[in-house]
A protein has these predicted regions:
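Glycine/threonine-rich flexible loop motifs
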Residues: 143-147
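Conserved N-terminal beta1-alpha1 strand-loop-helix module at the mouth
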Residues: 1-87, 91-98, 102-105, 109-110, ...
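Internal catalytic-core helix/loop-beta-alpha segment
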Residues: 109-113, 117
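Short loop/turn elements that flank and shape the SAM/SAH-binding pocket of Class I
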Residues: 120
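Short glycine-rich anion-binding loops that position phosphate/pyrophosphate groups of nucleotides
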Residues: 138-140
Length: 169
């Protein structure tokens, strides 16, 4: 099984001091870049222009976490902007296997995100094209929500699945 990676989110960063905020996390494995479209979640956050600014300001690889409706149609925007990894929600993707394969063919690591209520067994048919799995501890949307118990249960049940195919974070 892959190792645990540290990926601080820029969602709570001081955007007026983005470079300084990114300098503080220079030793992280990834910068976690939350993208919310106001449809899949009730909130609206960053687009590709901010991702480009992040990429210009740090050497830390960027994981674009797409909390959007129809991520299959938008992954190329974030790949073109320089995302090193793109994670899409299982619950939002119509053609998940195709989207993950497409990302990998472009040289972008492909991740899948599961909401707290989604069973981990849904990964069985796509695990061969998954570089990373993110188990949400809260329902997607706003920051500072109460932690859900579901992810710890999902993590325990995901171990056999992840062990069957080596994950590549």
């Amino acid at each position: 099984m892959g190792s645990i990676k540290i990926a601080p989110s820029v969602l709570s960063a001081d955007m007026a001091n983005l470079k300084g905020e990114l300098d503080k996390i220079a030793g992280a494995d990834y910068v976690h870049f939350d993208v919310m479209d106001g449809h899949f979640t009730g909130n609206l956050t960053f687009g590709v222009d901010i991702l480009r600014a992040v990429k210009r300001s740090t050497d830390v690889p960027v994981d674009a976490h797409l909390m959007v409706t129809n991520p299959d149609e938008t992954v190329d925007w974030y790949a073109d902007a320089g995302a090193d990894m793109i994670t899409v929600h299982y619950e939002a993707s119509t053609h998940l296997h195709r989207t993950l394969t497409h990302l990998q063919q472009r040289g972008v690591k492909a991740g899948v995100v599961l909401n707290p209520a989604t069973p981990v067994c849904v990964l069985e048919s796509i695990i061969d094209v998954v570089d990373m799995v993110l188990l949400m501890s809260v329902n997607p949307g706003l920051a500072a929500r109460a932690l859900s118990r579901a992810p710890s249960q999902s993590f325990t049940s995901s171990r056999p699945c992840a062990s069957a195919t080596a994950c590549r974070p």
